[in-house]
Curated annotation (Swiss-Prot):
Keywords: Cytoplasm, DNA-directed RNA polymerase, Nucleotidyltransferase, Transcription, Transferase. This is DNA-directed RNA polymerase subunit Rpo3. One of its GO terms (molecular function) is DNA binding. It catalyses: RNA(n) + a ribonucleoside 5'-triphosphate = RNA(n+1) + diphosphate. Its EC number is 2.7.7.6. The keyword Lipoprotein does not apply. GO terms for cellular component: cytoplasm; DNA-directed RNA polymerase complex. SMART domains: RPOLD. Signal peptide: none annotated.
């Protein structure tokens, strides 16, 4: 099995895997969607009552939104994730919550103001902050305040969408478009628009591949003078993450997760 990276950034990856079957490709896709651990807020405690600032001014910590709505918004905020942490139900603390499986956050802010995700302060793990600090949570009016504590734990998208790391996970066969220069007049225009996609060229034919994602090649699907060949052992994958994990971390975890599952199956069959 060979892997070739076409494009890689912190949140996006496009790559080719050669030497696998369609069922293996689909297993990788499902793992990328459902089985990647992610940190997300699970429990939120609202502290209601009067709050005084340093000058003695009194604020009311009741919010203009229902507590459940604010808690739901907090749960959907992407958080930086440490894959060395434990799932709470598998932790040595017995599910009580400790520094190995739980991250504690707090928000303490006075109105009038808008509470953003950047106001979510990590108490126990300072590095595990929100991915984006500009996500609005709730707007506070004069004399209003918010004082909460929250617990974040690891989970997967099998349990809830807030634990889904990836989006747009897709794959397709490696495709080659054998274009007749005689029958397809715009081949030179495509060559100029998609230079990386040119695989080979002769006096009568030019061969393109859409592995690099050049959208100009879409015209070839319905054009005369084009012979498309698909290889069902080579797959082009792409996906992006919400920033809780990098695209590279996500892919490596998914591949190792699949390997572990196959190893367990082989062991069980050999017993």
């Amino acid at each position: 099995m060979d892997v070739k990276i076409f494009k890689l950034s912190d949140k996006y990856i496009r790559f080719e895997i050669d030497g696998i079957t369609p069922s293996q490709a689909n297993a990788l896709r499902r793992t990328l969607i459902n089985d990647i651990p992610k940190l997300a807020i699970e429990n939120v405690t609202f502290h209601h009552g009067e709050i005084r600032d340093s000058e003695g001014n009194v604020y009311d910590s009741s919010l203009p939104l229902f507590d459940e709505m604010v808690a739901h918004r907090l749960g959907l905020i992407p958080l930086k994730t440490d894959l060395t942490m434990n799932f709470r139900d598998q932790c040595s603390c017995g599910g009580k919550g400790c520094s190995l499986c739980t991250v504690t956050y707090s928000i303490n802010k006075l109105g009038p103001s808008t509470v953003f995700s950047s106001d979510l302060q990590a108490v126990s793990h300072p590095d595990l902050i929100p991915v984006d600090g500009e996500i609005p949570i709730v707007k506070l009016g004069p004399k209003q305040a918010i004082l909460i504590t929250a617990e974040a734990i690891l989970g997967t998208a099998k349990e809830h969408a807030k634990w889904q790391v990836t989006s747009g996970v897709s794959y397709k066969y490696h495709r080659e478009f054998h274009v007749s220069k005689k029958d397809f007049e715009d081949w030179q225009k495509l060559k100029g628009a998609c230079p990386k996609s040119v695989m080979s060229e002769t006096d009568t034919e030019i061969v393109f591949t859409d592995d690099f994602g050049c959208n100009d090649l879409n015209v070839l699907f319905e054009s005369d003078g084009v012979n498309m060949i698909e290889d069902d052992s080579r797959f082009i994958f792409q996906f992006e993450t919400d920033g809780s994990l990098t695209a590279k971390e996500t892919l490596l975890y998914a591949l190792n997760r699949l390997k572990d599952r196959w190893d367990i199956l082989v062991e069980s069959l050999s017993e």
